[in-house]
């Protein structure tokens, strides 16, 4: 993402990170709401952002990864260099929830029942004026 948006990415052969790392976070970011200033995260990378794209700021860093988390709140772009989806990142689920609910504005009220009811209404509406042939064995 950083490279595609005009930033620069370098190879960190000697500074690569694999395993647990303590990330220092700027907790003023919506993405990091309720997450501590220093958290353990699971890293697995050999490349890193060397120059941020215009409008971005660093919201997380380690001693060997100066841009472990970045954001451009104005454009709605957020990126992390670690793995929030794994158990080895204890606050990863909180970060994902923040992305969904704080950043993207998801509501969290979706249920399979609501989906089924909505699809039945849509189908009934489409079939109200249609001809239907439904052979059965």
Task: Label the model's feature ranges.
Residues 3-137:
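RNA-binding accessory domains that recognize and position tRNA/RNA substrates
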